[in-house]
Regions:
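Bacterial N-terminal signal peptides that target proteins for export
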Residues: 1-12
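C-terminal segment of classical bacterial N-terminal signal peptides
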Residues: 16-25
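A contiguous strand-loop segment
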Residues: 27-118, 141-145, 150, 257
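C-terminus-biased signal that marks the final domain/tail of proteins
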Residues: 27-42, 68, 103, 134-138, ...
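Short helix/loop capping segments that flank catalytic or ligand/cofactor-binding pockets
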Residues: 55-56, 103-105, 158-161, 167-170
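A gly/proline- and charged-residue-enriched helix-loop-helix capping module
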Residues: 117-133
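A cross-kingdom feature marking charged/low-complexity
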Residues: 163-189
Length: 294
């Protein structure tokens, strides 16, 4: 994959330092995926829309030393530049959203995952897992109260992590799946203390868009799939793509979509990220095959 000129190559050492210093942050995000009969070529597509207060996002490429894990590319986000979303050299993609239906004070007081070498769960999973199946089996990484979306060339999955580390796992090889910022499975719903209006509205909207896009035998192209993440149907604060009603309020600051072609070959990574915190016009865009020279 060619890295955009504005990208910053962040070494593993710098990422370790950032995660050790960084407190947990809430991420109001929309996650969705499509697979099999929902996709024009029968492959798999996944996406994450990242909403947060105005912040700079950085495109990074991490190539660990031999024996220390897989190479990966994606976005480091916010003040502490934690790795937030991306895809690795084996073809595993992931993103996450906070379980915002649990009060922030309580979330911050809960245990949070750090690997023995200091990595948070997104970076750890991409460094050490090659497939969705392997990522699901890496149970040690699921500690924080968050929701993960995972995808590879054969399937997509959403994992809810509840307080105490219990999980729900929903996997698809065909059809669609979506999540936002509250628990939605029967085993997890009891942990919702207060569901935000935006989370409810965005979840209903992305589910409706996915259903409409795949009804009556229809399938989605990658362009059509990406367009869902840019929907502004519900205004500045409750749309999937949020412009924000306040300059310093929550708004969409980054977007990722990944396509795994049914025929095989390299995954296609689409990224959009804000390079200047207070300037929505600073959005950078790339779309390229993910390749690593190892």
């Amino acid at each position: 994959m060619k890295i955009h000129p504005s990208a910053v190559a962040i070494t593993a050492a710098l990422i370790v330092a950032s995660v050790l210093l960084a407190p947990s942050r809430a991420h109001a995000c929309t996650l969705y995926a499509a697979a099999g009969t929902a996709v024009d070529d029968g492959g798999v597509m996944m996406s994450k829309v990242r909403d947060w207060r105005p912040s700079e996002e950085t495109l990074v490429r991490v190539t660990p030393k031999p024996g220390e894990g897989y190479a990966y590319v994606g976005l480091a986000t916010g003040k502490y530049q934690n790795f937030n979303m991306g895809v690795n050299e084996k073809g595993l993609a992931l993103g996450l959203s906070t379980a915002g239906s649990i009060p922030k004070k309580e979330r911050l007081a809960m245990p949070h995952f750090r690997s023995k070498d200091g990595f948070t769960s997104p970076a750890y999973l991409l460094r050490h897992c090659a497939t969705v199946e392997e990522a699901i089996r890496a149970t040690e990484a699921y500690v924080d109260p968050v929701n993960f979306i995972l995808a590879d060339k054969t399937e997509a999955a959403v994992i809810e992590v509840m307080p105490g580390g219990k999980r729900t796992v929903k996997r698809i090889k065909t059809g669609t799946i979506a999540h936002t910022n509250h628990y939605i499975e029967p085993e997890s719903e009891a942990f919702n203390q207060k569901i935000g209006k935006s989370s409810e509205v965005r979840l209903a909207r992305i589910k409706a868009l996915l259903a409409d896009s795949t009804s009556d035998g229809k399938t989605m192209t990658f362009d059509a799939f990406k367009a869902l993440g840019h929907d502004r149907n519900a205004g500045p604060d409750h749309s999937i793509w949020r412009t924000g009603s306040q300059p310093d309020g929550t708004q969409t600051v980054a977007y990722m979509a990944v396509k795994f072609p049914k025929a095989g070959g390299y995954p296609i990574l689409h990224l959009e990220w804000r390079t200047k915190a207070d300037d929505p016009a600073s959005l950078q865009v790339i779309e390229e095959p993910v390749t690593f020279n190892r």
